[in-house]
């Protein structure tokens, strides 16, 4: 047994199941089409469990198994060299990237790197008003992509109601599809 729930509730399965340890390629049990090319995230958003679970530095998995769903935590924050490494691995294996599942950081997104291989939706976060100019820049880059393929996770509950609604409406006006994500305590 593993995952974020076990990380925050370490003793929940005591006496019932084995927890902890390492289980390489565990994502395959959940989704046989999924893979990770890196773990961790240096951004350290206050509401995110990734830095606590996986660290605030990236662990690059050089020889990751190429599969159609890429679940990395923050693809566009990876070094340019490693992003290019991921893209070249997909090209060499001729496996289509159907879903860059975890998404891209709007502040560091470079469409040119990923447009060559991403066949699925584009996912971004719009966590607070400060992200506005960066999300708008990304939406302009992707203006020719259908609305349904521009998915923006809009965090709510972290700013006043009016600010949260403003961000939702901005995503719509910029041609994106808002996915509202309520902020939750990490131990909830």
Ranges and model annotations:
Residues 1-34:
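Glycine-rich beta-alpha loop elements in corrinoid/cobalamin-binding modules
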Residues 1-6, 49-141, 148-157, 177-182:
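Core AdoMet radical
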Residues 35, 43, 132-135, 184-186:
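Extended, charge-rich low-complexity interaction segments
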Residues 36-51:
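Local cysteine-cluster metal-coordination motifs and their immediate loop/turn environment
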Residues 41, 45, 124, 171, ...:
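Conserved, mostly hydrophobic/aromatic
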Residues 91, 143, 169-173:
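Anion (oxyanion) recognition and catalysis
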Residues 158-188:
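Auxiliary Fe-S-binding modules of radical SAM enzymes
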């Amino acid at each position: 047994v593993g995952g974020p729930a076990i990380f925050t509730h370490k003793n929940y399965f005591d006496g019932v199941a084995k927890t902890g340890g390492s289980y390489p390629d565990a994502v395959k049990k959940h989704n046989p089409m999924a893979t990770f090319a890196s773990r961790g995230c240096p951004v350290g958003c206050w509401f995110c469990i990734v830095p606590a679970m996986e660290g605030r530095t990236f662990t690059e998995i050089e020889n990751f198994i190429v599969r159609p769903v890429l679940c990395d935590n923050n693809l566009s924050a990876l070094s340019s060299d490693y992003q290019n490494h991921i893209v070249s691995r997909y090209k060499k294996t001729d496996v289509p990237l159907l879903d860059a599942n975890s998404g891209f950081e709007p502040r560091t997104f470079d469409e040119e790197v990923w447009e060559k291989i991403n066949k699925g939706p584009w996912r971004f976060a719009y966590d607070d008003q400060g992200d506005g100019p960066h999300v708008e820049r990304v939406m302009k880059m992707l203006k020719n992509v259908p609305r349904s393929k521009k998915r923006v996770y809009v965090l709510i509950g972290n700013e006043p109601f009016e600010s949260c609604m403003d961000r939702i409406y901005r995503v719509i006006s910029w041609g994106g599809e808002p996915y509202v994500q309520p902020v939750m305590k990490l131990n909830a």
